[in-house]
C-alpha cells in the first residue's frame, strides 16, 4: 500500500542493497508485487558499483542495510523517491512529492520480475532481465532436482542477489514450505560447522 500511495506501481524498479536477512525476501516480494521490478544489488558492491546499478536501472525505491547505506552518496540518496531500512522496514528517507495512487497490475508470466546485475568482471555490472515465468520455471526445476518440504531446513550461504540463491535458495523453499536460515558472517568452514550444529 505504501508504495502505491507514493506512486510506485507496475514497471517501477525497487532496489534491494543488503546482506541476506529474513527481511530480504519481504523486500523482494514487496518489490515484485503488482508488476513492480526487483533490482537486487550484491551486498559487497562498493558505493560506486551500487550507485551505477541504481542509476542504470532507474530505481525509485531502495531497501538498504545499515552497512550498505553508509556507502551511498547524498546525491544518490536524494535521487530516490523512498529509502527503507531493511531491518525495521521503516522509511528512513522520502523524497517523493504528493501522493499519487497508481492502478494495480497483476503480473503476467512474461512481465519483467527482476533486473539482476552481474559482478561486472569485464567492466561495469550489466543487468540481466528475468521474467516471472523464469523464476517459476526455476522453482519447478527445483522439485525435480531435490524435493524439499515443510520439515526441511536450508542454510542460505550465497547472497540473495545471486540468481541461483534467489531462485533455489529463497523462492523454491518458499514454494515448498521449507525453513531457511541466514548466516550473519562470512561462510568460513569453522563458522559453518558451528552454524550447522544449531540448524
Language model regions located:
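Conserved AMP-binding/adenylate-forming
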Residues: 2-45
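Conserved AMP-binding
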Residues: 17-21, 42, 51, 148, ...
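Short hydrophobic alpha-helices that are characteristic scaffold elements of the AMP-binding
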Residues: 28-34, 56, 162, 171-175
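Conserved adenylate-forming
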Residues: 47, 55, 78-87, 184-199
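ANL superfamily adenylate-forming
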Residues: 67-109
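Conserved pre-ATP/AMP-binding loop-to-beta segment of ANL
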Residues: 99-117, 124, 147-153
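Conserved AMP-binding A3 loop
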Residues: 113-137
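Conserved AMP-binding/adenylation subdomain of ANL enzymes
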Residues: 136-153, 160-199
Amino acid at each position: 500500500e505504501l508504495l502505491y500511495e507514493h506512486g510506485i506501481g507496475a514497471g517501477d524498479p525497487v532496489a534491494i542493497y543488503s546482506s541476506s536477512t529474513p527481511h530480504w525476501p519481504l523486500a523482494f516480494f514487496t518489490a515484485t508485487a503488482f508488476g513492480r521490478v526487483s533490482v537486487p544489488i550484491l551486498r559487497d558492491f562498493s558505493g560506486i558499483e551500487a550507485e551505477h546499478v541504481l542509476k542504470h536501472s532507474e530505481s525509485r525505491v531502495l531497501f538498504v542495510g545499515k552497512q550498505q547505506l553508509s556507502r551511498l552518496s547524498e546525491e544518490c540518496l536524494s535521487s530516490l523517491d523512498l529509502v527503507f531500512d531493511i531491518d525495521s522496514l521503516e522509511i528512513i528517507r522520502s523524497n517523493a512529492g504528493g501522493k499519487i495512487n497508481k492502478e494495480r497490475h497483476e503480473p503476467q508470466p512474461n512481465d519483467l520480475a527482476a533486473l539482476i546485475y552481474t559482478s561486472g568482471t569485464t567492466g561495469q555490472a550489466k543487468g540481466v532481465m528475468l521474467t516471472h515465468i523464469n523464476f517459476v520455471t526455476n522453482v519447478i526445476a527445483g522439485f525435480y532436482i531435490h524435493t524439499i518440504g515443510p520439515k526441511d531446513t536450508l542454510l542460505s550461504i550465497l547472497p540473495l542477489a545471486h540468481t541461483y540463491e534467489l531462485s533455489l535458495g529463497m523462492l523454491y523453499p518458499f514454494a515448498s514450505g521449507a525453513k531457511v536460515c541466514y548466516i550473519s558472517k562470512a561462510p568460513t568452514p569453522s563458522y559453518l560447522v558451528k552454524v550447522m550444529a544449531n540448524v
